[in-house]
């Protein structure tokens, strides 16, 4: 057997051992995590756009514009929530909305009664104060009102009582007015959320928010 044949046979049996660097198989390629669908991404973008448009506005000094900002925030929240949570919040909001409107009507009645009390107390206080001021002008009135008679005691008692009622009713009416404003804002938020949850989208939610005018901005 020739030397060339021996070398050829040796190379055939040891071909796998000729590699300088051993072969390493590539790692297993895992599938990518699922991402949000196109419509969900558009809803998220629209939600952030609406919220940014509302928060970046310089208006909102009056109560109506504050309610409008709260409505913008509720609508952005509805667009951001998943569909099951959106429907749950919608049904709960419809039930809460009825009770809030009943509470609002009750607070408005109490506020109207307090305004009448304030008006009557103010009129009586003004009348008794004017009667006390007349004592400076007329000496006869001064003698009648500064004596120990029933007229003097009645006028001073009414003045003190109506002044106290005027101050107390004013503080209570201010608190009720704050509660009315807060309840109206809550109603606006719930109504906006329910309206946004009830909307049917055609799939194209890419709205150019630069063209949307908010308030006076």
UniProtKB/Swiss-Prot annotation:
Pfam annotation, one family: Orbi_NS3
InterPro entries per record: Orbi_NS3
Main function: May play a role in the release of virions from infected cells.
The family this protein is said to belong to: Belongs to the orbivirus NS3 family.
Protein's UniProt name: Non-structural protein NS3
Species of the source: African horse sickness virus 7 (AHSV-7)
